[in-house]
Amino acid sequence: GVKYIPISKESLPNHIKAARDSILNYIAETKKSSVVNGKMIFLQGSPKLLKKEGIHIGRLSGIVAHHTPYYLKRNQLPSFQTNCIEEWEKKIDAIVEETISEKMTLISGIPPWVKMYFEKIKKKTGKTIKDVFPDFELFIYGGVNYAPYKKGFEKLIGKRIAGIELYPASEGFIAYQDSQTEKGMLLCVNHGIFYEFVACDDFFNNNRKRISLADVKIGINYVIILNTNAGLWGYIIGDTIKFVSTNPYRIIVTGRVAHFTSAFGEHVIAEEIESSLNDAVKIIPTQINEIHVAPQVNPKK
């Protein structure tokens, strides 16, 4: 469903800053500045905004589209008109037509959206993405776990490609991948968010204890709680994370609070299921598009 989250004048620049820094970190680490010389696409929601009681309302990606830094905007695709198309299939078709002959170096979006875009290009040309966009260098993604999509993407692209994982949310930009060699994403600790955490094992207890960054430990699953300069206090976004480093603070997203099953006290979380699936496809090469997990408390057989 739709949720309305405040974005203040104080919080909006932090979304832009974190997204910008993710690209700048990549350039600083790899010394490959050519990634910003070609065309780049950000698959996002419509930038059309409604106005109610003097307040602009829209999708986060659409709002942010109005504030793209000028040095990125000059090479940004698609056009504003194409970006405003509401019907997703028509929008992707229009984006394909607009970008297929361009020198694309950077492509960004939620993996399912980008997958649809790549599939339409392959259907139209009969070629892999590396043959259509030989200068394509960097894939920026977020929103869902990329691991289940990785093999499918490598097949569509035709080669391995550098990637940057982002952890943006309407509530605040939480983390981004700052290294091609280190595991995890760098927690944004100077971006208008004060973080608190509750260990997942204690989350459903009445006496659950919140802790600050000073007390977190590596390897423990935490529910993340946000206090922001947009006006959110003690806000539970529903995600679970795990620290892989505390100097600097680096995290991985392990799932959702609601995505667990414990019919028999087993406390199975999304991270464990996805890890098992990844191990399985290494043994039996296959591609998994969708999964469903549920306990059979009273099976018929």
What are these language model-derived features?
Residues 1-17, 21, 29-31:
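Conserved AMP-binding A3 loop
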